[in-house]
Every structure is written in structure tokens, then in C-alpha cells.
Amino acid sequence: MGMKRLIFLVFLLISFSLFGGYAYFSRYPVLHPDEGLSFVISDLENITLNVWKISEEDFLKAVFDPESFNFSLLEITRPIYSKKFSSEEWKEFSFPLKDRGFYFATLVSNEGTVFRRVIDRSLFIVTDLEAIYFSDSEKLRLHVFDSDGDFVEGAEVLLFEDSKLIDRVFTGKDGVVSITKHFDTFYIRYGDSRFFGGVYFSGGGLEREKLFFVTDRPIYKPSDTVHFRGQIFSFEEGLYKAFEKTKVTVSIFDTKKNEVYRSEFETDELGGFSGSMKLPDTASVGLYKVNVDHGGRRYYEYFLVEEYRKPEYKVEIETDKDVYISGEVVNYLVRVKYFNGQPVAKAQVAYYVRAFPEEGSGYLVYRGTDFTDEEGNLRLGVKTEEGFQGSYRLEVIVTDESQRQIEETRSVKVYADNVLISPLDRYVSTSPGKQVRVKVKVTDLSGNPLNGLLTTSSEDSTSTVAVENGEAIVTFTPKEPKSYRIELSFGKANTHFYVYAYCGAGTSSEFVINPATNTVKPGDELSVQILAPGKVMGVLGIVSNRVYDTIPVSFTGSVNLRVRIPKDIPEKNLFISFVGLDDNGRIYKLERLNVLLDTNFTTMKILFDKDQYEPGEMAQITIESNVDRVCLFLVDEAIYAMVGAEPPVLENFLYPYMNYPRTRGGFPHYWRLYVSRNSFRNKLASLPEEKTFADFKQNALPSKLNVREYFPDTALWIPSLKLHNGTARVSFKVPDSITSFRATAYGFSKDRFSQTESEMVVSKKFYLMPHLPSFLRESDVIKISATVFNRTSKTLPVQLTVELPENIELLEGSSSRHFLMEANSSHTETWTVKAVSASEGSFVKFVAVGEDLNDAVSMRLPVERFAFEREFYRIMLLDGKETLEIPGQFISSRIRFLDSIVPLVEDSLKRLIDFPYGCVEQTMSRFFPAVVAASAGIEVENLEEIIQRGLFKLYSYQHNDGGWGWFRFGESDDFMTCYVMEGLYFTMKAGYDVAESVLQRGIEYLRKHPSAYGSYVLDLYGVNHEPFKPESEADLVFLSLSSKEALKQLMNYVVQDEQKAYLNVYSNNPLISEIQLNSVFLRALAKWKEFPELERKVTNYLLLKKDSAFWTSTKDTSFVILALLEAMPEYASTTLKVINSENTFELKPGEERSLVPGSLTVSGKGIVEVEVVYIEVPKEAVSEGLEIKREFYKRYELLIEENKMIVDAFVPIGRGYVPRSIHPVEKEQTEELYILPYKYWKKTIEYRGVPLEINGAEVKIKGETYTFFRIETFNGLILVFFRNEALIYDTEKNTITRYLDVTDAGFMRSGPVFLMKGFVLVGDEKIPVPEDVTGLSCTMDEILLRGENKTYWYRNGEFVDLPFVARRVFFWDGKKLVAENIRFSGSSKTLRNRVFEVVFDVGDVKIELGDIIKTVVRVKGDGNYLIVEDFIPSCAQVLSNYREKGIEENKFSYSWYSSWNAWYSGREIRTDRVALFARYLYGNSFDYVWRATAEGVFHLLPARVYPMYSRGLYAHTDPDVLFIGADFIDGRDDQP
């Protein structure tokens, strides 16, 4: 029996417990004469087995169409057998069917009553025939034999596809028939015998044509260009050869299966083609699929798109050997090297050694921190535990001078002894009472056979078996239907195998296939011996990617066969696959052979004209080979190290190694009836299906993805280079990267191919490497540094100079440093600088000079303002004179005089395009008006790129239901879907390709979710739909775009004066604003041209609503621009007279001029725009309808030695408590009770003579029942706490006292304690409490109040903050905490269901270089569609994939896929900030983790929150200053 069936049956038996007792037919429905019809009964009484003999016609009708077949017609006849069975435990019964023919059987409960229920049904064939088949994608070979082992010649085989007869064939000699027509079911007739079964055709077969497809590298970032090359091959005369000139179509699909690229190519004369696709910066990350269509065939390839950061150095871990014996020392060597081969000296290495036993969970063995030596090496020795068997894994986190981290792991195998115990079968199936025999090999680790005694044990029995010449036979007889674990030990070594005693036996471990050799050549004749303990009949398949031959076999004991190895095999492995039967049941056996192929691959060389290059040099590559064309590319070695992928090997692609055959070989599969509504099988069928995740997305590429992105990942890409006389030369400029590039070349001719690799090292004997942040903020003080590398063989006097721009000043010391550098060494210098003023274009230059050697690097280091930009904006439709006041301290200003709205549209479009965020609405609002503007003749810069970026993001954000929401996650929104679909329509109308799959899904969504806006959009697409009946005035607005009647109805809601007009209409949807509705109204007016004067006034209204570069939001701006473009109004104008403070000047239409602070008076006629940008330096928190707070927490790693694991403790920055140690403790056992709801069901617990009858969340005391939250006792008092009340029962006085308006209650040594609104009551004393207190955590002696993220300790008349919360605190003395369910203040994970002792020190929680910090932002208030922005310090490396460690996690516990479960809709990490987008505030905080990569004083702008689509709500925190490093302590009691 195959493992899949075995696992399925085990699953059945486990699942049966869901439904109580059960009964079902077991084993196969094809039976041989006198073989028992088998069924199982467990925990059921009076189950009746009924058996009917039926006709061939009824059998075929029933098995082909069981859902339609009327089984009651069979059941009304008298059965040939009927008997009742019962069993209290699992028991298998058998009823013999002697005569050949067809049978129907049922298992029925309550037979003969009105409660009769059919539990299971089945159809059976009793036959003396058996069948075995082998198949690939092109053919199937079917062997038919009888129960005596004779193969049946002349049997009629009827072939069916989807229950329809498609052909009839007959078996030939040896009972075999070869069939090329595809079918799924067959029916055999031979004399009076019949057989029925199903088959599968496999995916294997001869690949007569292959496509080799390669991209220049395996991974890309959004905005990169993907280069690809394809080569088609055809199989001729046993070899693959290049194809001829032909045509192919290449299609590329994004992660949502939307087509984003399609192109047709004409190949060269060898069947080669190449192309490229530019990814926009909005391209979704994940796995992209490539389809290549050629000649009716379709090929699939993939590439990965990720927001990665390329590492600058690599970490390698070596061991002195791969296999160890317990007790030995594992000697690890950690090598840290830059990609140019130079060592990373003095790199900090945090290391963790974990042990993973073969059984059980892994645990921490050893940890520490050290530094690499001058050669970039760190040596570490770890002794393995005695008797341990499993693996040891070293995990390292390395940081260099830049403080960017790289991680690496290395595992080794550890054996308990120099002994290897190898059962030939790890999983054995049998039936209760039937003995199994398992052959076991016992050798040393080198494979030498051992002698001695093997100890076996199972449950309570232990025995020994003799091992002779490395072999032993272990026998075991299961007694019950269950699984058994058989332990095997020899010396210190041990292992196990499993016996599943639920069904028939499987392959005996004594069945052996012995080929004369495991290495063959095409055309060889191979001698194969088969050994078996008894009589065997079956088929030997010669298979690999296809079925080459099948050989029928029938023998007793042994047989010798001669097997011909196929001459035209293109695979490097061949398999001997045996399928058959012996006395124990079915046999499956597979042997793998190596095939020595003589392929048509030739040699190739890549020669560089130098061993090493300097950045910017010209390099020449020479390629030598006897092929015609070469595909050549050079990729940064860091890419391959980061991804862990190598360029594909062409020879192995054409002539592959095979681990398993791609063919099918086995017995036919059989039918099962699922026709009883109440049958157990139907209940199982209703259980949820197993789900699998298979999009290969590596959502959390590990933190190896670090360091800089300044230089190209692909240095050279030449898809097709011709060779002349076997040689080609290429010259190119070497990139500025100091690294190594891997050169890969594939060579192609008609019948010869080649591949080779080489390395190009880019380095210098003397060079420097700056360590700078990505930006600074005004007033930041930071230590910047640069490392100089001297790779010469002599000592050098070095001068290292930093040249700073005017806006960055040096605080101490000289800008030039002088030092001596030893040969082959590195040296780092540090400068403390301060950012004085803002500048986007500031550059820092480093120059190093050592005698006649030098290097210089200039890097941009922008300085941002420590301020928020504000805007004063006015539009005036001037016809006369107007005066206003211009604010001071502005950074830019202008007044502009216009006679056309086009400049306004152009400016707003540009601001829309440059808007920094990218939800669905903002993406749509960028390119939708851009498309319409371009169609109206307005020039839009980079329109193609804008559209491509927008389409890619919209494809990625479309939901599975076809709709769009605000972001990728969350629910689909009707308005947003309409908005996107309207924009896609106009994009198509403008001549751009839009993925058909996206449109179809969107249309389907609009059909299922009718709306007024959707009705108009469906009309655009010409889709028939039911007319939408307006439910509000806002519906009329959208319907007016396609209905003149709806427009006329809107006239009832128009408000107007001489200059402007607007619709007094509102929508309940917060996404639809008044400006937006009036913009749609203007579009309808422009379309129907019924009310020209009203059209002019609505245009004026919208222009006057413009209060900045935007109309309130990106969405409103987009809608207004669309309306203005359709209305395109004209305005009369004159010369504009301007008086600004003491300045007087005139402007003509189209002219503009800057302004000065003070009054501004303008007079004339036309459109006047005034725009002033000024700065506002935040000094304190602001709260206008919303509240926001920001907190910082430092991570401490705490080792739980008893559990051998590490947990993260995040505690607040500042003066406080530093956690130092943690370990689990046992609860002290007392008579006192502490009971939470649902701990007990229907249980009575007595306390001091008082019975407490507990049932779930209810307790009965003295005849009264209470629904409780908690029950506690102390010193004879019983506390029952329930909603807003507490009850104290005194067992001595027999009295009950009730307390009302209680938030929480507990006990101290002095008596009960009650938390009430605003105070805590201790005896008669009322103590006011902080606002965020939610509960009590008092000990017997200390008042502890539980806050949201801290505990308040009442001491000496005031509250002290403690950096933890706990459900229950047993002890606290100011340093030692004993509690359960502890969560540290900044941690997101609770140490659940355990009591821990944590020891704290009182001291400063300071941020040091390299520390891990968590920023938590908490938001309160009402609002929707909010943006939360937090401005990060300039020294922060945000660890976007950081996973906090709780007691269930280990250091390297990464998940490559996790579903989105955050309360907010989306998050974006940018250079200077982290932004969060929340549709609603149904969560109140978010956090992110960062690493401090530099020392200094860092100024943080306030975190802020504001709505995206409305005004009036706003909040920001206080600004903060972070002091990082020992040299930057400000002396305050807390920080920030």
C-alpha cells in the first residue's frame, strides 16, 4: 500500500472521533475468490451487513454514475447475506465471497426500523484477474495476469474517458497492451472474468523540444530592467540540437497573473531570441511568470522581484568535518570577506549554537559575542553533548564598521556513536496479528559492517536481535489496530521505525533488486537479480522521464533478468521500478541507476586581460570556444550570495539528473461510493480541504539583504555574441563597485553547446570606504567615519581627509588625519559633525593619500529641515481690487496672473504625480487625469512611465473578488472599484494596453455590486445591466454622466449667486466629498451642454475651492482636473496691477513674480494665484480632534537557561529598570484558590468548608449562582469578581459583602483591595490612580496597578513606573519579579502560561551603537482614511522583517510567508519616515524596529496623524532628541 493511502486511512481513523462510533468498508473493492469482503466497526451495536449479487449492467451503471444510480432498486431485493455485528472497539470483520461476479453491500444501523440509516455502501468485483500499468504523457503499458501468476493473452480491454467508451484493445503476448490514446478508466473481459480500474497518465515523456530561458540575474528591484534570452532545442538521434529560425511569443505576468508584457520575436538561425522589459517602480514584489509560446507548445519560466538591499560583504562558516560523534568538539571557522576577496577585520560576530535532536524541539547550547581577526576570521569550538543524535547549528549575526548586519548559518550532523542503524523500511503497514519482518543494516559511519546485539523495544517489551556482518532481521507482531514506534539501539546509537497496523501489509524489506552495477551506458545490457522470500508476480519497469520498457515477471525465491539500457536516453539516471504482489500483499520497489551519457557539449574559456581591475578601467574579455554564438553576462557576486541561487547549468537542463522517475507505475485506482447523505464518508468530504501556499514568494527575504545600492547589479549583458574562428572579444568599462563579478557564458551552435564561468575582481591596492547615513536632519550631531584599506606589501604613511559642505560643520579635531598603516591592514577614522542647515545637494568627500597611491569618494548626504512645510494659497477670480496679508519666514513665494486654467492643471498634475504615497486612490489619481490631459493636448512629461507604474500597482492591488479597496489588503470598496475601472477605460481609449483579465474581473465585480457610479462605468464598457434606481441625491450626480434626465433632476439642488454655483448634495460615503460631487456635476454639464451659464459658475466654484496645490486631497484634485479638462473654460483678462509691501509692479497674462512679506493688493481682471510656502518649527504636541504619542524601547535579549531559549524584552528608554535575568519557577502550592472562567466544568471545590460549584464561567455559592471573571481566596475570605461588582464571602462569619462600581479586586496581606473609577481602595484609604490603569496586580505586600503597557508601583506616596505588565504578580521587592503571563512594556509577545522570575537592576536604559530599538506610535480618536507618519532618526536601519522572539521562538525563526493581519491597511518605509495608512482607527498603535548604526545626537520631527480626504483633524507628538553612544549623554533623568 502506498504512503498516501496509508496516511489517508490513519487520517480517517483519527477523524472518526469527531463523529463518535463508525463503520466503513475497508481494503480494496477488487477481491479474489475466497478473499474476504472486509469492514470495520468501532463503538457501534447492531450494524447489519447486507450483500447482494448484481448484474454486470447494474455494476457498470452504478460505478460510472453513482450520483444518478438508484441504489434503492438493489436494496429492495433479498440479499444473499445479511447479519448483524457489534463492537465496542475498533475491529475488522471479513465475509468471504467465493463466486466470481459483481456485488453490492451496505452497512446499516437500526435495520428494520423507521430510524434505519445506511452508514456505508460499496460495490465489489470478485475476479481472478489483476492488472498493473506504467505510463508517461504519451503512452500507457497495461499488463493483465491471473491469480496463478500467468499473464493473460487475448483479454478484451474497453477504454473509457469521462465514462464514455472511446476504444477497445486486446492484450498480446505476456498479457500486455501498449496504448497511446488517453483514457481514465478501463474494463477487462476475459472468459467469465472481469476487472475494472482507473489509470493516470503522468507528466513525463520524451521532450522532443525544449526551451532554455535565462535572465541576466535571478532577482530584480522595481524600476530595474529585466533582460532575457531564450534558446529552443529539438531532440534528434538521441541528442538535443539547436532549432531553426522560427517565431515565438513571450508574455510576462505579475504576481496577480495579469499580463504586463507581450512581444513576438523572430529567432536567429539557431532558434535563439532575446528581449527586455522595464519594471516600473510600482511593480509588485513576488514571483513573475514568463510564458513562451512556440508551435502550439507553452513553456513556463519565473523570476523574482523584491525590494532588496545588496550585501557589501559575505559570511562563510566552515567546519573541520561534516559528521561528528557525540562528545567531540565542533570547530567552526567564521570567515567574513568583502566581495573583492578582502577580509573584514574587527567585525562584530554575535553567535548562537543550537542543538536539534532527531526527536523534539531545538534548544540553545551556547551563545556569545566576539570579533574577527585581521584576516576576517573567527574560530569557535563547541563540544557536543554525550549521547546526542541530531544536528548542531551555528547561527551568526555579523556587523562591520557600517553597523549593517548580515546573517548566516551552518549545520553539522552529530551521531551518538560511531554506529549507523538503517532500517530498510521506516514505515511498515500491516494488520493486527500479522507479523512484519524488517531488515536492518548496522555499520560504522564509514559503512563497514558491525557484529553484535541490536536492542529492540516497543511499548513495554524489549528484546535483542543478533547482528551478523552488519545485518539483522527485526520481527514484530502488532496486537491492536494502531501505530507502533519500534526503538532500535546499538551501543549509544539509536533510531526507530513505525508499524501501522490498520490495513494490509506492504512491501517486505526482504524483497531486493540487485543490479550487477549502478552505472551504465546507453545500449548496455544489464544483469538484474530479484530476491524475494516467497512467490512473486509483477512487472519490472525501465523508466525515467518516460517508460522505456516493461518486463512481466513471475517467480519464487529469485529470478535473473537481462535488461537492455535504451540507446536514445537523454537522462543521466534510469530507474528499475518493480510493481507486483506476493503472499503479504502489494510490492513497490525502485532502484536508481547512473547513466554515463556522451553529450554534445564542448569546452569554452572566458579570459580577462587582467587578474584584477580598478573601478572605471576598461576591461577586455576574450571568449574561446568552437561554438557559433555566445550569451554573456556579468553579475555582482553579492546577488548570488544574497539569493542563494546559481545560473542554470545548460547541460543538466538538456540532459538532466533525475532523483525520481516522472512516470507512473502501479496498480489501478478503484472506486468509492459517496452517495449516502449521512454516511461517515460524506461527513469527511465536508471537512475543510487542506490548503497549500505555492506562489514561491520569499516575502521575508532574510536580513542578509543589507548595505549599499549605488552600483549596477548587472555589469554586462550581451544576449548574442558571434564568434569568429572560435574567438570573440568584448571591451567594457568596469563599474565603480569594489566587489567581484561572476561572468557566465552559454555557447550555441547547431549541434554543439558549451557553458563556463569566470570571476572578475574589482578592487584597489589602496582604497577607502565611507560610512555615512542616508540623510541628516538639521541640528543632528553624528559620528561619521571612513575605512582605509592598504592591500600593499609595505607600510604606508596615510593622510585621510574629509571635505564637508557649508551646511555641515566639523565639531572637533582636524578634518585631516595622519597615521601609519601596516601592510595588508585596514584603519578607520571618525569625525563628529553637525548638520547646520538644510540642503538637498550637499556632498561629503573623502580623500585618502598614501605615498603615490590615492582614492577619493564623494557621496551625497542631504540635510533635511527640522520643520514642517506649510502653504498659504489663494485663487482670486478678479474683477476689481482685493487685498490680503502675506506670511513671513517663507522659503518660496509667487504671484501668477492667468487667462487660462491650463497652467493650474499642469501644476496640480505635477504635484499629483510627485505625491509620495501610493494607495489605490492615489495611484489612480496620478495617472487617470494625466491620460485625459494628454488626450486634451496638454504635454505630460514621462506619461508612458506614469501609466506603466500605475497599471502595475493597480494590477497588484486588485482583490480576488475583482474589486479594489483603499490598499492591497482590506475589503473591496464599490466607489474605489468604479474609480479604477473608469480610469482604465480612458487609458484603453487613449491607446494603451490594459490586461484583459483585470478588466473582466472588475466588470464582474461591478455586476455583482450595483451602484450609480458603477452603472455609468458599465455603460462606458458597453455592458448590459439592470438600470440602477437612485437611492440618494448623490446617486443622481453619478447617473447624470450617462442620463440627461438625472442631470435635470439635479437642478433642484443647485445653490448659486452671480459668480459661482454648486450642488448642495452630500454622500454618506467618507470617500465621496462635496468637491468631488460638484466635479462630476461639472462633467455632466460639459457633456450635455444644456446649462452653459451654470457650467461657468460651477467652474468658478471649484477654482475658488482650491486651497493649495491640491483641492483638499489627491482624489478631489483628480476629479476637479478631470472636470476642468472637459469644461475647459476661458477667462477674459487685463493687465494686473500689484502692490506688495513697498513694491509696485504689473503682470501680463502668463507672467509670475516672487513676493515679500507684508500686505498684497491686486487690481485688474483675470485669474490670480498666490502661493507661499513657509516653515513651521514644531515645539510641542498638537491635538485637534486626534491624539498621538510616540515611545521608544530598547531590546534586551534574556536567556532562559532552563528552556535553552532567548526572549526579547523591550523596555522604555530613560531612567528605569534594566532586565538582567529570567528563569522559570514553580508556583507555590497553598490552600488558596485562584480560578479563572472555564478552568473547570461541573466540578465542586471546597474551601474552608464552603463548597464552590463551578461550571465554566458560573459558580454557585450558598445557593446563589454568579457569572464570574475571577475567584480568589485568602485567609478564609472568598472573592468573586464579576462585571462591575465584587463579592467577599467570609467563611468564618458566614457573611457576604457586595461592592459596586468595581473595576478590579484582589487581596493584600491587610485584606481586600478594590480598584474603582479614579482610585484604588486599600482598607479605608483612597489612593488616586493614573488614567490608564486597567487592573490590579498587587502582591501580598505591594500595591501594583496594571496599566496598558506598564505597571504602577505605589511607593512612598507616589507611583513608580515598572517596565512590564503581568496578569498575576506573586512577588516584587523593587528588583525581583515573580509573575505569570509577563509582557515587557514594549514587547508584543506575552510569556504565557508560565511563572517566571525576572531580576532587574535600577539604572539608565541608554541607546548604544548597534542596539535594537522599537518605536511605538499610539493614536486615539475618531476618523477614517488616516495617514500616520513617523520620522525616523538619521542613524536608523529599519529592520522591516524583524520578528520578535517569545518563548516559542528562536534566534533564526523566520517565516517566509505570513498573512496580513495588521489593523491598518498598509505601511511604507521611506528614507526618512515610516508611513502607515488606516481606513479606520480600530487598532490604536503600530510599531517598527530599527538598529542604531551611528553615535550622536539625533533630532526627530514629531510623529503626526491626519486624514487624507478631509480637513479639521490633526495631531502631532512632541519633537524628540535621541542621544546614542557613551559620548552623547545629556544628563536628563529620562530620554527622550
Curated annotation (Swiss-Prot):
Tell me yes or no: is Signal among this UniProt entry's keywords: yes
Q: Which UniProt keywords apply?
A: Protease inhibitor, Signal, Thioester bond
Q: Where is this cross-link: Isoglutamyl cysteine thioester (Cys-Gln)?
A: 919-922
Q: Where does the signal sequence lie?
A: 1-23
Q: Which domain of life is it from?
A: Bacteria
What's the family? Belongs to the protease inhibitor I39 (alpha-2-macroglobulin) family. Bacterial alpha-2-macroglobulin subfamily.
Spell out the protein name for this chain: Alpha-2-macroglobulin
Q: Which organism is it from?
A: Thermotoga maritima (strain ATCC 43589 / DSM 3109 / JCM 10099 / NBRC 100826 / MSB8)
Ranked from the top, the taxonomy reads:
Bacteria, Thermotogati, Thermotogota, Thermotogae, Thermotogales
